[in-house]
């Protein structure tokens, strides 16, 4: 070992190390990292030992526990693993043992908080094999894939067991004019012949009066029969935001699925159909109604402009589409036009885009569409991925915290302050 403890007290330690130069500069850099890792192991061991007791009896939940003596354990850190002797306790009635050091230092499985934070963050973004390779190549740390999964699972269980934790949003209420709530689903593959089923994701986005998006937080849940778990979690998040921003106008933005509006009506004052979904129907009408593609493209551009910028534009387009049914076109194309007509009829109250734009309200569901890709597809649908409910729930919880501004750091601040 090229590093050793020169001095250690209750408040600091001094590590001395010798770094050899070796061949190419790349090899020297590898030596530097190796020595720094050795120093990190020694420093972490010294710091961690400060959380141990002197072996005297203690009370846990008003029950007396006595030490069973020093017991050794390997601890995993960002710098490597080391073996440490610490006191383990048990009550006179037997049962589960208790380690004050593990509890007070907030050890996760056998990982220090920093390493658990590092591993679970990486695992939220990449498969365990990629995390393993990253740790080995970039940190000179080898851990098994199962350990990466177990630590991440333990972090996910902490998230799941603390639903009452409140997360601050770093945006002053005076800056927030609109809050858009959206939800959508996308498919992922389940284990045990579960096939492809729909996972749900929700977003809560804060907007300034000029329409600039200031902040977004996400909620997601793996496929389930019904959407009870997702709704329960999303409603809790919505209510926590409403307590912070009671003065804002709440807007529901979504595609045309009926169950979206059933949910959003209860929690928003204004409901807006995604403008771009409406334009997709206009595209279908254009293709079905015009033999000349140049004429069809010209009509589509004008129709999209009318829909967005003209008062009662949706109603005007609805009437125009009805006239297209009188054209001499194939029944299949008439069916396409009729589908668009029915869609516009059902969504008319949510298509006042001219008014919405004048007030700088968000009219597109791009945030939630992106969330389907970023929160779910980007990780859950990596090559060869199949998921159990527990594994999917863990990764989605980690991803939501990681992708929601400041929440990941807040979560770990709370973890390290659990009594």
Labelled PLM ranges:
Residues 49, 53-108:
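An N-terminal low-complexity regulatory-tail signal and nearby short nucleic-acid-interaction modules
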Residues 1-45, 88-419:
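Catalytic center-proximal scaffold of phosphoryl-transfer enzymes
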């Amino acid at each position: 070992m090229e590093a050793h403890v020169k001095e250690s007290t209750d408040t600091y330690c001094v590590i001395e190390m010798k770094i050899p130069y070796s061949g190419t500069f790349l090899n020297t850099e590898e030596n530097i990292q190796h020595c720094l890792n050795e120093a990190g192991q020694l420093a972490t061991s010294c710091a961690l030992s400060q959380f141990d007791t002197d072996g005297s009896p203690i009370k846990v939940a008003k029950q007396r526990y006595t030490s069973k003596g020093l017991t050794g354990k390997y601890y995993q850190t960002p710098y490597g693993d080391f073996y440490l002797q610490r006191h383990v306790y048990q009550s006179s009635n037997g049962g589960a043992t208790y380690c004050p050091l593990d509890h007070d230092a907030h050890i996760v499985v056998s990982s220090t908080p920093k390493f658990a934070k590092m591993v679970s963050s990486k695992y939220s973004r990449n498969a365990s094999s990629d995390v393993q390779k990253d740790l080995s190549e970039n940190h000179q740390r080898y851990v098994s894939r199962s350990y990466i999964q177990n630590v991440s699972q333990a972090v996910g269980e902490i998230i799941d067991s603390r639903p009452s934790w409140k997360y601050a949003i770093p945006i002053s209420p005076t800056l927030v004019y609109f809050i858009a709530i959206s939800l959508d689903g996308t498919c992922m593959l389940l284990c045990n012949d579960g096939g492809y089923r729909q996972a749900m994701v929700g977003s809560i986005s804060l907007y300034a009066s000029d329409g600039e998006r200031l902040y977004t937080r996400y909620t997601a849940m793996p496929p389930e029969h019904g959407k009870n778990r997702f709704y329960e979690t999303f409603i809790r998040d919505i209510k926590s935001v409403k307590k912070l921003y009671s003065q804002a106008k709440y807007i529901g933005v979504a595609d045309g699925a009926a169950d979206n509006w059933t949910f959003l009506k209860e929690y928003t004052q204004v409901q807006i159909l995604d403008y771009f979904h409406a334009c997709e129907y206009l595209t279908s009408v254009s293709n079905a109604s015009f033999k000349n593609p140049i004429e069809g493209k010209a009509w589509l551009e004008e129709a999209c402009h009318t829909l967005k910028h003209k008062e009662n534009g949706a109603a005007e387009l609805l009437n125009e589409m009805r006239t297209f049914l009188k054209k001499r076109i194939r029944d299949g194309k008439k069916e396409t036009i009729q589908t668009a007509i029915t869609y516009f009829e059902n969504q008319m109250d949510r298509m006042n885009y001219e008014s919405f734009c004048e007030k700088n309200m968000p009219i597109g569901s791009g945030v939630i569409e992106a969330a389907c890709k970023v929160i779910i597809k980007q990780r859950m649908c990596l090559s060869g991925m199949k998921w159990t409910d527990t594994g999917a729930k863990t990764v989605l919880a980690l991803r939501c915290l990681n992708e929601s501004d400041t929440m990941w750091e807040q979560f770990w601040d709370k973890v390290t302050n659990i009594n």
